[in-house]
């Protein structure tokens, strides 16, 4: 249950810090970082997700263990350069393979292996 409604979840937020919520309590700590990829309920995530939540969140460990936080702009996955796509190495965003010719990049060094990407 990652939604923050209910009696178990309450905290005040300092706008200069990130709100870190666990399943049972909330703690404000500025140094916690998202871990990518992370495993949650049998799936691997390479970026922040809305799974089981109204807002995008990430795990603070490689395998979700109850430590997580809402994602800020700086938490989202970054392009991994260089990356491999269809056996070719790219050192910048590409429109190759994009149906609508929109620039994209892999968020892992090997798109062919992981299939994880984002728009540039």
Swiss-Prot record:
State the tissue distribution: Major component of seminal plasma.
Q: What is the native source organism of this protein? A: Equus caballus
A single GO cellular-component term from the record reads: extracellular space
Q: Please give the biological process terms from Gene Ontology that the record holds.
A: single fertilization; sperm capacitation
Swiss-Prot/TrEMBL sequence repeat ranges: 1-13, 16-28
What does the record note on quaternary structure? One glycoform exists as a monomer while the other forms a heterotetramer with HSP-2 and binds heparin.
Region feature (2 X approximate repeats):
1-28
What family is it from?
Belongs to the seminal plasma protein family.
Outline the extent of the Fibronectin type-II domain.
29-73, 74-120
Highest rank taxon of the organism: Eukaryota
Q: What are the UniProt keywords, alphabetically?
A: Disulfide bond, Fertilization, Glycoprotein, Heparin-binding, Repeat, Secreted
PROSITE patterns assigned to the protein according to its UniProt record, in alphabetical order: FN2_1 (PS00023), FN2_2 (PS51092)
Q: How is it modified after translation?
A: O-glycosylated on Thr. There are two forms of HSP-1 which probably differ in the amount of sialylation of polysaccharide.
A single Gene Ontology MF term assigned here is: heparin binding
- Name of one Pfam family that matches: fn2
Q: List the disulfide bonds.
A: 34-58, 48-71, 79-105, 93-120
Where is the protein found, in the record's own terms?
Secreted
Function, in words: Could enhance the fertilizing capacity of spermatozoa upon interaction with heparin-like glycosaminoglycans present in the female genital tract.
What is the protein name stated in its UniProt record?
Answer: Seminal plasma protein HSP-1
Q: Which residues are glycosylated?
A: 5, 12, 22, 27
């Amino acid at each position: 249950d990652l939604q923050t409604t209910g009696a178990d979840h309450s905290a005040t937020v300092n706008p200069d810090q990130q709100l870190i919520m666990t399943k049972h309590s909330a703690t404000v700590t500025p140094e916690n970082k998202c871990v990518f990829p992370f495993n949650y309920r049998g799936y691997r995530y390479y970026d922040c997700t809305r799974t089981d939540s109204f807002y995008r969140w990430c795990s603070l460990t490689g395998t979700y263990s109850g430590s997580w936080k809402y994602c800020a702009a700086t938490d989202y996955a970054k392009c991994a350069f260089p990356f491999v796509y269809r056996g070719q190495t790219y050192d910048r965003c590409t429109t190759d393979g994009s149906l609508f010719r929109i620039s994209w990049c892999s968020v892992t060094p090997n798109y062919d292996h992981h299939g994880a990407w984002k728009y540039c």
